[in-house]
């Protein structure tokens, strides 16, 4: 099966709010597992369980947004959005939520603070790209860029990635994101310049 087989040509993207996530949660976890529990990431199945827990928490946060690409895009509602009613595989997704103010210190946020110093406060209220995943069968067709662009639209956004995984920094560099630092096992990117 190819990305075109899964997506019926060019995948249709649809935007979901947090209240809509429970209906697609299992499909997102399946795609996450296919992406991150295989090379080049090689995460453990326990990491997929942790992703499901994080997803549940993120979806309850005000301002959470998910952008999905799936085969269900061929069926649309009155607004022209894919309905997803048939449970089609998710070929890719991007997840984001507003960054709290003041900038958090838990999880990887402390490493981001150490890398950016005082400029980190600029990221408060920006959209944090919490996850971007493209199913292996749908890669190399521009879907990752489309998902990222749809998620961030005209909003200031930031993300972190793991530079030791082949292709991650090349992807964001080629997509025009601005690299702001590498250290502590992460690389930080924004889609616009930071105020210093």
What are these regions (language model features)?
Residues 53-71, 98-106, 128:
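A short helix-loop-beta-strand connector motif used in the catalytic cores of GNAT acetyltransferases and
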Residues 29-45:
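Helix-loop element at the rim of GNAT/NAT acetyltransferase active sites that forms part
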Residues 131-153, 173-174:
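Conserved acetyl-CoA-binding loop-helix of GNAT-fold acetyltransferases
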Residues 1-26, 30, 34:
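Conserved N-terminal entry element of GNAT/NAT acetyltransferase domains
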Residues 145-146, 163-185:
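Conserved active-site alpha-helix within GNAT-family acetyltransferase domains
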Residues 63-94, 135:
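Conserved beta-hairpin
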Residues 95-131:
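Conserved acyl-donor/pantetheine-binding loop and adjacent beta-alpha core of acyl/acetyltransferases
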Residues 126-127, 153-165:
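Conserved GNAT acetyl-CoA-binding A-motif
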